[in-house]
UniProtKB/Swiss-Prot annotation:
The lineage of its organism: Eukaryota, Metazoa, Ecdysozoa, Arthropoda, Hexapoda. InterPro entries: Chromo-like_dom_sf (IPR016197), Chromo/chromo_shadow_dom (IPR000953), Chromo_domain (IPR023780), Chromodomain_CS (IPR023779), H3-K9_MeTrfase_SUV39H1/2-like (IPR011381), H3K9_Histone-Lys_N-MTase (IPR050973), P-loop_NTPase (IPR027417), Post-SET_dom (IPR003616). Histone methyltransferase that specifically trimethylates 'Lys-9' of histone H3 using monomethylated H3 'Lys-9' as substrate. H3 'Lys-9' trimethylation represents a specific tag for epigenetic transcriptional repression by recruiting Su(var)205/HP1 to methylated histones. Mainly functions in heterochromatin regions, thereby playing a central role in the establishment of constitutive heterochromatin at pericentric regions. Involved in heterochromatic gene silencing including the modification of position-effect-variegation. This is Histone-lysine N-methyltransferase Su(var)3-9. Its main location: nucleus.
Length: 635
């Protein structure tokens, strides 16, 4: 003990002091209680013990700074906090103030400890690179470059102002690995530090420490040291498990985004720059209030949103603020990117609700459509949902002023004479003076547009497998309800390829009188959209009834217009022969590819009689079909 005391020059005449009886107000710079020739100072604000050498330190005096040598024999000057007598008395008398003071000191401790760790990392970077680099970084250009006045050519440690934060000297800056060769880096297979694999090899690194190397071709991230910018993109200085610090490399975010060390890195820096990040976020949120929800962003960007990108940008901005950097170009670029990320983040909340609403509508729709093939709903264009006032139905709703059709009293007897109904038998179409509608082998329509379809009914001798029973079995093709990109709203496309003459679906809605349809049509024309379909197959007189699919309907509600359509509308009678109340059904006019949008001509301009369609000329509506023969005006 005596030897140790002699070595450090302890005054053996010092007596243990009773601090409770110590009158702080009477202490002076020359008081023996506060003076030591060889001082050991516990500098709590930088997180380590500094040993003063040949330095007289006065803990309570007019001295404002202390100069000492650190463990690397570098001169360090630390500014001491000078407490007033009033504050000292308050701390001694108030336990609450002492606790608040200690909390503040601990916060400073965490902040400066992080800065010290970065400073240590920078010193390691000044060591010469080893010749045995990992295989994936053999092409890295490690030539050092002199600091340039151009911010884009700076090494990563300077682009965010680390030089001013860590107090490094100018000659240290020149030795930091440059990012000039970053573009040549090959992507590593990064993985998280975990249990050693059976194939791990043991080797000595340059420090003489035994380290376990991962299998050949794999490199494990041991630690992410810092983040900087290269051409306005974040890059990370990575320490690899089993390799010396001199073999650290700069990696892009894509290379290390999925590593667990990235989560630790982000969490650590968010705590370090908590105050700066909070202030920056508040500033960006004020700018965000003035931006429309989806201005200059796409649904694809919303779906691909990653919170990590925003977190990294906020950390980069905080580093610039903390360093007092005068650079404007880089923070501006990062700020614009962070603002867009926050805009996308805001839209993502709306997107989640939208997808939930669309999924619910899809579920209800397919429940109504059973047992028909499912219909998929998707919107990759905007954040719109299906109108909540629209009710999906399976069969037509008969209005109060519309008479209910009476059941037919006539049915064919084809199976009594032959095995099945064919074009050569006296089937239902023959009774109405029309042609047999379908080909027997393919079940495809064999009629031209404008013809009528008469199917077998419940009074016919044939069963449900009859080739003249197609529409009554319902939709048999899968479809997709999607949002169009040309401003036409929702549309319908084929999920699979369709042949010419295939039945697609029936036009379903409310069957109302023509007088009521005229009243509703005025409101629809004002909105530039109509769902009124006149049941006027009998052209000898005006139509008596109209189908309105605006508020009640099925998938046909969403089929758009085209001047060159791939669908045609046919009138069809099944259980009754009331000419004024046919079913309106859609058949394909030509082969349709999978994914092709389905459309029909709302206004048959090639036919002056204009059968089945409701014409409205009150408002001119632009046609957006984009076909070569487009009439430019819909109605």
């Amino acid at each position: 003990m005596a030897t140790a005391e002699a070595q450090i020059g302890v005054n053996r005449n010092l007596q243990k002091q009773d601090l409770s009886n110590l009158d702080v107000s009477k202490l002076t710079p020359l008081s023996p209680e506060v003076i030591s020739r060889q001082a050991t100072i516990n500098i709590g604000t930088i997180g380590h013990v500094a040993h003063g050498k040949s330095t007289v330190v006065k803990a309570i005096s007019g001295v404002q700074t202390v100069r000492f040598k650190n463990e690397l024999e570098r001169n360090i000057t630390i500014k001491l906090e000078r407490l007033s007598e009033k504050k000292i008395k308050n701390l001694l008398t108030s336990k609450q103030q002492r606790q608040q003071y200690e909390i503040k000191q601990r916060s400073m401790l965490r902040h400066l400890a992080e800065l010290r760790r970065h400073s240590r990392f920078r010193r390691l970077c000044t060591k010469p690179a080893s010749s045995s680099m990992p295989a994936s970084t053999s092409s890295v250009d490690r030539r050092t470059t002199r600091r340039s006045t151009s911010q884009t050519s700076l090494s990563p440690s300077n682009s965010s102002g680390y030089g001013s934060v860590f107090g490094c000297e100018e000659h240290d800056v020149d030795k930091i690995p440059s990012l000039n060769g970053f573009a040549k880096l090959k992507r590593r297979r990064s993985s998280c530090v975990g249990a050693p694999t059976p194939n791990s090899k043991r080797s000595k690194n340059n420090m003489g420490v035994i380290a376990k190397r991962p299998p050949k071709g794999e490199y494990v991230v041991e630690r992410i040291e810092c983040v900087e910018m290269d051409q306005y993109q974040p890059v990370f200085f990575v320490k690899w498990l089993g390799y010396h610090d001199s073999e650290n490399t700069w990696e892009s975010l894509a290379n290390v985004a999925d590593c667990a060390e990235m989560e630790k890195f982000v969490e650590r820096h968010q705590q370090l720059y908590e105050t700066y990040i909070a202030k920056i976020t508040t500033e960006l949120e004020k700018q965000l209030e003035a931006l429309p929800l989806m201005e200059n962003i796409t649904v694809a960007e919303v779906d691909a949103y990653e919170p990590l990108n925003l977190q990294i940008d906020l950390i980069l901005l905080a580093q610039y603020r903390a360093a007092g950097s005068r650079s404007q170009r880089e923070p501006q670029k990062i700020g614009e990117r962070a603002l867009k990320s926050m805009q996308i983040k805001r839209a993502q909340f709306v997107r989640r609700k939208q997808l939930a609403d669309l999924a619910l509508f899809e579920k209800r729709m397919n429940h109504v459509e059973k047992p028909s093939p499912p219909i998929r709903v998707e919107n990759n264009i905007d954040l719109d949902t299906i109108d909540s006032n629209f009710m999906y139905i399976h069969d037509n709703i008969i209005g109060k002023d519309v008479p209910k059709p009476e059941a037919g009293i006539v049915g064919c007897k084809c199976t009594e004479d032959t095995e099945e109904c064919t074009a050569s038998t006296k089937c239902c179409a023959r009774f109405a003076g029309e042609l047999f509608a379908y080909e027997r082998s393919t079940r495809r329509l064999r009629l031209r547009p404008g013809s009528a379809i008469y199917e077998c009914n419940s009074r016919c001798s044939c069963d449900s497998s009859c080739s003249n029973r197609l529409v009554q079995h319902g939709r048999q093709v899968p479809l997709v309800l999607f949002k169009t990109a040309n401003g036409s709203g929702w549309g319908v496309r084929a999920a699979t390829a369709l042949r010419k003459g295939e039945f697609v679906c029936e036009y379903i809605g409310e069957i109302i009188t023509s007088d009521e349809a005229n009243e509703r049509g005025k409101a629809y024309d004002d909105n530039g959209r109509t769902y009124l379909f006149d049941l006027d197959y009998n052209t000898a007189q005006d139509s008596e009834y109209t189908i309105d699919a605006a508020n009640y309907g099925n998938i046909s509600h969403f089929i758009n217009h085209s001047c060159d359509p791939n669908l045609a509308v046919f009138p069809c009678w099944i259980e009754h022969l009331n000419v004024a109340l046919p079913h309106l059904v859609f058949f394909t006019l030509r082969p349709i590819k999978a994914g092709e949008e389905l459309s029909f001509d709302y206004i048959r301009a090639d036919n002056e009689d204009v059968p089945y369609e409701n014409l409205s000329t009150a408002v001119r509506v632009e046609c957006r079909c984009g076909r070569d023969n487009c009439r430019k005006v819909l109605f």
